[in-house]
Regions:
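DPxDG-like acidic metal-binding loop motif
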Residues: 80-139, 143
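Phosphate/pyrophosphate- and phosphate-bearing ligand-binding catalytic cores of soluble enzymes
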Residues: 149-225
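N-terminal assembly/interaction segments in proteins that build large macromolecular machines
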Residues: 33-86
Length: 336
């Protein structure tokens, strides 16, 4: 692959992510129209998501008309099997965004035949209007703006360090070899892309996700790898872990990419291997049974009769297993 072309892709992805981040910040902590993808109000979409994705799609299509696009909010582009595909999550962490918490990301991952080759993630700053772009290209290192990034170097989890796990981790996972007591300070921040960025800079020693979707991790996976780390995945519940080097066989279609699912653990190489050997995921059947039982006895409703959120989810963000009625956006409100 032409190195100059790859540098251009990274540079453009960085500017596109910065532009999407600026759009998000224009809507942050302001009244927003909110729609929900499911009847239980667990998967919100805002006008900010849609405007950011439209900006990214327009920018990519203008600069790379022969590249494909896979986005969370809209359909794939018409390119069926493009050499390059841009995988977009315009706003990962929508619930945080809606509640005024600056813990979200706008994520871009660029794939060549399914292999990540460039990434750019906008991460907001604590101060209003601030933010950085975390970016990388294959074999080019990872950076926060101009500062080089590096994962932690501890070969095993350490107490006092931060670890990203899903909010339901105590129920979803079983641990061997005393790992549960040595995971460190567990956090679930509500944005997979944000947690992977924090892992790439060493603020998190590692992070783990149950079944994220491709747009959750396409950018962050390359970021962690280029920061000296390792990202492992497995597609069967307790199958063998292997390095996440690509998201499908050679020349995947955009539909292939959209359908990708897999557990992910990210951190330095020794740490991910250590954790991967000592963690086992429990069956989702138990959680489905518990949900059914709670519904039968009325424990899945609050005092008003409204359904409570299910926490047995698929990742650290707004993607738990759902019971969507298949009708798309079913609820609407304005959040001030």
């Amino acid at each position: 692959m032409d190195e100059a072309f790859l540098e251009r892709v990274e540079r453009d992805a960085t500017e596109f992510a910065r532009g999407a981040g600026a759009l998000l910040l224009e809507h942050f902590r302001r009244p927003l129209d909110v729609q929900y993808k499911s009847a239980d109000r667990r998967d919100p979409v805002t006008e900010a998501d849609k405007k950011a994705e439209a900006f990214l799609r327009d920018s990519i299509s203008a600069s790379y008309p022969d590249h494909g696009i896979v986005g969370e909010e809209d359909e794939n582009t018409e390119h069926e099997t493009p050499e390059f595909a841009w995988v977009l999550d315009p706003l990962d962490g929508t619930t945080n965004f809606l509640n005024g918490l600056p813990v979200f990301a706008s994520s871009i991952g660029v794939l060549r035949r399914g292999v990540p080759v460039a990434a750019a993630l906008f991460i907001p700053g604590i101060e209003p209007g601030g933010g950085s772009v975390y970016h990388a290209r294959l074999n080019g290192g990872a950076f926060q703006d101009d500062r080089r990034l590096a994962v932690t170097d501890n070969p095993q989890p350490e107490r006092g360090r931060l670890t990203g796990f899903p909010s339901f981790w105590l129920r979803m996972y079983a641990f061997n070899g005393g790992l549960r007591q040595r995971l460190g300070e567990v956090r679930s921040l509500g944005s997979i892309a944000f947690e992977m960025a924090m892992t790439s800079r060493g603020s998190f020693q590692m992070c783990m996700f149950t079944t994220p979707k491709i747009w959750d991790v396409a950018g962050g996976a390359l970021l962690v790898n280029e920061a000296g780390g390792k990202v492992l995945t497995r597609t069967r519940r307790n199958g063998a872990w292997h390095p996440l080097e690509g998201f499908r066989p050679d020349a995947p279609t955009l539909d292939n990419l959209r359908e990708w699912r897999g557990a992910v653990v990210a951190g330095n190489e020794a740490l991910t291997a250590h954790v991967g050997q000592r963690v086992r995921q429990r069956s989702f059947a138990w959680f489905r049974f518990r949900r059914w039982l709670r519904q039968k006895v009325g424990l899945n409703q609050d005092a008003t009769g409204a359904p409570l959120s299910n926490t047995a989810g698929a990742g650290n963000t707004e993607h738990p297993p759902t019971s969507s009625n298949g009708t798309g956006l079913t609820q609407r409100e304005t959040r001030s």
